[in-house]
Amino acid sequence: MNTEATHDQNEALTTGARLRNAREQLGLSQQAVAERLCLKVSTVRDIEEDKAPADLASTFLRGYIRSYARLVHIPEEELLPGLEKQAPLRAAKVAPMQSFSLGKRRKKRDGWLMTFTWLVLFVVIGLSGAWWWQDHKAQQEEITTMADQSSAELNNNQSQSVPLDTSTTTDQAMATTPTSPVDTTATNTQTPAATTAPSPTVDSQQNAVVPPSQANVDTAATPAPAATTMPDGAAPLPTDQAGVTTPAADPNALVMNFTADCWLEVTDATGKKLFSGMQRKDGNLNLTGQAPYKLKIGAPAAVQIQYQGKPVDLSRFIRTNQVARLTLNAEQSPAQ
């Protein structure tokens, strides 16, 4: 009878109350139980008050209660009905797995994005290369055009130089013609063939055999302008004797030395082309004119320029490998 009453009384008590009563009967404190079970005192207190901590999984809570029951000598079978109420097993929340098709779509989208990125990169590189090639081709065409123009100008200058030489020879012959009548009237012993010879060479031979009196007449009869025309074999008078002084060096002189073949065009302030054409390696130019000078240089790296005794900086044209267009002012300040 007493056993049944005790059993009914134990069933009326909760799991926490039974564990607390058993601990008190053994004379153990909550601190001692916590140390033996390696738990916190707050966890032991929650178990005795039938509280389930929110941050503690039900599986761990059931294990703690069973360990506590073995410590205070309570059979686990008597606590199972209470455990089902106090710490029911809760299904673990498992995150739903993403569909394989979703991952496949994302991978496909990333592939399209990468393809578009590479396509844009290739287009940018292609446009940059096309722009560089067009600029390089335009420079080469410009250099070729300038070289052709300079060749045409040189050919025109050579074709025009022939009439100029003919007129100069004619002027020299006309300048020597008035001396023939004087020679004829001065001496009656001279032969007719000698009086009609027009060439300066025959005149010089006649002057070699004319008597001194006739030579004086020739000298007096020769006009002043004819005296300035000298035959090819005559030696020029010294500058001191002629009263002519050597001119001073031009401060605006432009000196250029070439280390490689280079096309060049130089124009002064009056628009006169001082030079236009191709200069070969190891060549040099010394030009004078009215400043400022305008220069076009096909290969800036192949020429060294000195203006007013100072070198001209062409490094910015050499770095970009472009045709140099610059103006040299009187203050020796090259401008683009």
From Swiss-Prot:
It is a single-pass type II membrane protein. Residues 30-49 bind DNA. GO terms for molecular function: DNA binding. Residues 148-164, 202-217 have a biased composition (Polar residues). Residues 19-71 form the HTH cro/C1-type domain. Residues 1-111 are cytoplasmic. Its main location: membrane. Residues 133-336 are periplasmic. It is found in: Cell inner membrane. One of its GO terms (cellular component) is plasma membrane. CDD domains: HTH_XRE. Residues 148-248 are annotated as: Disordered. Keywords: Cell inner membrane, Cell membrane, Cell shape, DNA-binding, Membrane, Signal-anchor, Transmembrane, Transmembrane helix. Residues 165-201, 219-236 have a biased composition (Low complexity). It holds the Pfam family HTH_25. PROSITE patterns: HTH_CROC1. InterPro entries: Bact_Cytoskel_RodZ, Cro/C1-type_HTH, Lambda_DNA-bd_dom_sf, RodZ, RodZ-like_C. It comes from the Bacteria. The chain crosses the membrane at residues 112-132. GO terms for biological process: regulation of cell shape. Cytoskeletal protein that is involved in cell-shape control through regulation of the length of the long axis. Belongs to the RodZ family. NCBIfam families: PRK10856.1. The helix-turn-helix (HTH) motif in the cytoplasmic domain of the N-terminus is involved in the formation of spirals to maintain the rigid rod shape. As this protein is anchored in the cytoplasmic membrane, the HTH motif may contribute to protein-protein interactions to form the RodZ helix, which is localized beneath the cytoplasmic membrane. The C-terminal domain may be critical for determination of the rod shape by probably interacting with enzymes required for synthesis of the peptidoglycan layer, including PBPs in the periplasm. This is Cytoskeleton protein RodZ. It comes from Escherichia coli (strain SMS-3-5 / SECEC).
